[in-house]
C-alpha cells in the first residue's frame, strides 16, 4: 500500500502510515535524501494534538541520519515553503492534514526551493521507508541537533506584508478572519492588523482537538454570520494549515476559489501583461470562456498542489488555483498561501475602489452539485458498477455543455462527485438520480452538497 497521496502522506493519527514507527522511518528516509543537499531541515506543524507525536518521531529519524532540525512550531504550510528558501535549508517538512479533522495527520515535504517534492522522490522515500537503513545511520559525533528557530513568526508576517503594495493601507477596512483553530491562529489577524485594518478574529483558540471543527474554510457559516453582525467589508476563512482561503463579501455571500482566481486574472490582465493562468480539472467549465474573453490562456492540471505548480511552471503562469480555495501567486509563492491570496483580493478592492461584491461580480460559475461520498468497498469496484450510469449521465449533460467528475480523493476516503451544466434543473435531477443509483449499489449517500 502506497503511503503517499496527492499531497504527501496523510491518514488517521497513530494508525499506519501515521503511526510512530512508520513516521520514524519516514524521518530517516527524508534525512537520507536531505543530507545529499545539506545538513538542515526546517519543520513546522499545525495545531493537532497528534502533532507532538509525529514531530518527535520525525525529529528522531532526521537527527539519527545526521541532519539538524530547526523547529518552527505551529506555522502555515506556505511559511515553511518560504522559510526553507530564506534559511537555505535542504528541505522543509510540514506536519498537517490540512482541512481534515483532528483525527488525521500528515506530512508534506518541500525541496530546497520551497517546491513540493516530485513523484520520483516520493517513490525513493517510499522505498527507503521499507528498506533496512541501519548502515546509513550517522556516527554518534555526526548525529544531528535540534533547535527552535527564533523570530520565525515575525519573519513570515513581514514576508506576507511585503506582497501588499507599499503605497496601500487597510485603514478604514473591517475584516473578519477565521483561522480555523489551525496553524495561522496567531498570524492571520496580525497580518491585516499591522496593515491598518480593523480586524475581528475568530477560530483562534486551538486546543488540539478543534482544528477545522465547525470553523474555517470548510465551515464558513460562523464567518458569514460575524461579517453580517459586524458590518464588515469582507470575511476571510482559512483552513487548518492556511493553504486555502474561502471569502464572503460584505453581503455575506460566499466566494469560492474559481471566483477568486477569475477576479485576480481580470485585475492582472488590466494592469499587467499576464498571459497564462492555471486551474485544475475541478474548476468550473465556465472559467475557460471567461479567461478567453480576458485574453488569458487557461491551462488545466490534475488535482493537487504539486500538479498545479508543475503546470504553472511549464506554461509560465502568473496565477493558479483550485476551486477549493488553493491560490498560488507565482510572483510571491511556490505553493498556495491563503494570506498572500487574501492580500491580493484586498489590494484589488482598494486599487479599483470597489466592494468585495463588486470585484467578484463579473464571473458566474456554471451551476453544479458537488458531493463528497464516503465509501468502504474498493473504489475500482465502485467505478465498474457505476460506469454505465456515468455514461448515461455524461450523455444527458452533454446537451447542456455539462460534465460529470467521479474520482477518489487523494487525501481522504471520499469519492468526489461533481455534476455541472448550464441547466440547473437538469444538473439537480441528474445528481439525485446518481445518488439513488449509488445507494442501490450499497455506497453511502453523498454529504456536503453544494449548489451554485
UniProtKB/Swiss-Prot annotation:
Record's comment on post-translational modification: Activated by phosphorylation.
Pfam families xrefs: PGM_PMM_I (PF02878), PGM_PMM_II (PF02879), PGM_PMM_III (PF02880), PGM_PMM_IV (PF00408)
Molecular function terms from GO: magnesium ion binding; phosphoglucosamine mutase activity; phosphomannomutase activity
Source organism superkingdom: Bacteria
GO biological process assignments: carbohydrate metabolic process; peptidoglycan biosynthetic process; UDP-N-acetylglucosamine biosynthetic process
CC cofactor note: Binds 1 Mg(2+) ion per subunit.
Active site: 98 (phosphoserine intermediate)
Modified residues (Phosphoserine): 98
Role summary: Catalyzes the conversion of glucosamine-6-phosphate to glucosamine-1-phosphate.
NCBIfam families named among the record's database cross-references: glmM (TIGR01455), PRK10887.1 (NF008139)
The protein, known as: Phosphoglucosamine mutase
Source organism: Anaplasma marginale (strain Florida)
